[in-house]
Structure formats: C-alpha cells, structure tokens
C-alpha cells in the first residue's frame, strides 16, 4: 500500500531561507556566558534579517565596532557552547 515515509532533514539555518548569507540590522549587542565547562564573555547580537526573522548571531574575532542599527551580513554556523546561537 503505502511504504514507510522518508524522514525530512531539519533545516539548521531556517532564518536564511536557503540563502548562503542574509543582511540584517542589529537590534541589540550584548555579551553572554557559555555553557558549563567553559568560561568567557561571548559577544553576540540580536539581528533582524531581511527575511523579517529575528535571530541571535555570534560576533567572531577579537574586538568589534557593532552597535544598535549596524548593518551586518549573517551566515549560518552554530557556536557550540552558546545555546540558541546558530548564526555568525
């Protein structure tokens, strides 16, 4: 009759809507602390993308000049020790 359904792979970067990168505007720039064995102040930003989705994005590198209303280009890629941060 009907065979078993194939599992549909879950999209890890849904907010990018299939694009490699997406532009956005920083709504909040702040620091958070990582999960248990690690200790630091990781720089992250809340970004409203052109796809009208608001995501939390990591700010890589040492030092940055981002503030509220800064235009940023967001790509996929999670930060393992920050829960909920799936963009850079």
UniProtKB/Swiss-Prot annotation:
The keyword Ubl conjugation does not apply. GO terms for molecular function: rRNA binding; structural constituent of ribosome; tRNA binding. GO terms for cellular component: small ribosomal subunit. The keyword RNA-binding applies. Part of the 30S ribosomal subunit. Contacts proteins S8 and S17. May interact with IF1 in the 30S initiation complex. NCBIfam families: rpsL_bact. PANTHER family: 30S RIBOSOMAL PROTEIN S12 FAMILY MEMBER (PTHR11652). This is Small ribosomal subunit protein uS12.
């Amino acid at each position: 009759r009907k065979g078993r359904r194939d599992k549909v792979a879950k999209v890890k970067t849904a907010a990018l809507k299939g694009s490699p990168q997406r532009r956005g505007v920083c709504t909040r720039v702040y620091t958070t602390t990582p999960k248990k064995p690690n200790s630091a102040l990781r720089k992250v930003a809340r970004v409203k993308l052109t796809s009208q989705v608001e995501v939390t994005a990591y700010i890589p590198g040492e030092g940055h000049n981002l503030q509220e209303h800064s235009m940023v280009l967001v790509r996929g890629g999670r930060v393992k020790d920050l829960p909920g941060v799936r963009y850079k």
